[in-house]
Amino acid sequence: MDRTKIGFPAEDYQSAPLPFTTVTTKMKDGTYFKDFFETKLPLVSKSKVTDKRALGKKWYQDIMHLIPALGVKVGYMIYPSVGSMVLVARLFSLIFFVLTMYFIIKKLKAYQMIFTIISVTPVAIQFATSLSYDSYNYIAFAWLSATLINLAVELQENKEIQLKDFFLRIILPSIALYFSKANSRLLYLIVLAVFIVIVAKKLKLSLTKLQVLIGSGVLIGLGALVYIFRYHDQLRLVVSKFIYTFMEPYYSVLTTQVISGTSTAAIPAWFYPIQYGALILLFLSYTKEQVPRWFAWLGLLINLINLFGVLFKFAIDPAFTEHVITGPQGRYFTVFILLLAPILTLLAQKISVKSTGSWLRRIVLFVSLMALALNLGVTTLRSYYLHLPMDEYRSGIEHYIFK
């Protein structure tokens, strides 16, 4: 589409700060609706597109964008304007997200409430209406996570799992995850672990805790040695970047403002501790071990590998501005929280959280609904009226991890 017809750059405008001021000006001038919803945009030949990111490099990368792309196509058929295409595409993504997550959560044998609450947080709602791959990535990860949790529940109950049944249940979500974001594929480590445990049970093999600890320590040690050997010249610099990153008070690494082109704005800062507090209480309310302990610890390990792996990748890459908008974004980490329920169950056994009746569930639901109400309310007021439009863009560029 030729976006210059409505005053936008012809190329990838979401990576530049210009649209913020452009949109703000249009709102003040009263031309926003006319330009975005009434102005018809002509098609542009692929041969004239200089930003090749818009065309895609490999066919399988397009699978993640299939649903919003279909929405854009239908939106253009309805009316060839930016507003029509964006609204229909977001609607398609939202319907896809809601329906798939409903069936995923319905089939879960444990932690249904946790999956539900995390999936309706403001950052997840941004995934649900994303025009990018975020919705697909979240669903693919949640699907395979739920499948693995169900298998782990059966292992905890000492039910026999046939290898044929294992592969039949794991194949489709594994394929779906393969076409998602690269860091999400860390989940394959749990797939491998579950497979090994099933085979070991078939062969009647058993490992002691000491053997497991030694084996895990050796693997982690080898991984650390590889990084040290490969990046030894940069190690001190990277460590200092990590320290400054986690000490900086201004810019949160786990931000809800995941991309400059989000469909919603962040919730007010004062509400974060309330939301996190309710989520922590929900996690700690699960005291029954529903999956094996090795599964719980592996879920925690994968969260840590993902967190530090993503930060490490950005810390050592001097060309980060060429392929990211604001650096390490919340969407890289949020979906991994789904794997923390088992390990926090072990913690909950040490910290007792008791509730009478369904009061805890009601409180968590109330906080979640309030978060969504605030989130959508701020969005309705347009976030660029409430804070400096360049804040998010500048915070990514000036973040300590890039210095």
Where are these regions (language model features)?
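Interfacial juxtamembrane loops and adjacent helix segments
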Residues: 2-86, 318
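Transmembrane-helix signature of polytopic, membrane-embedded enzymes
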Residues: 80-83, 101-122
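Transmembrane helical bundles and short interhelical boundary loops of multi-pass, membrane-embedded
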Residues: 223-251, 356-403
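Membrane-lumen/periplasm interface segments of multi-pass, membrane-embedded glycan/lipid transferases
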Residues: 26-27, 38-43, 67, 206-208, ...
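Specific aromatic-rich, kink-prone transmembrane helix
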Residues: 103, 138-156, 343
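Membrane-interface alpha helices of multi-pass inner-membrane proteins
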Residues: 166-183, 187-193
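Short acidic/glycine- and proline-prone juxtamembrane loop motifs at membrane-interface regions
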Residues: 130-137
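Perimembrane helix-loop-helix junctions
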Residues: 147-161, 165, 187-217
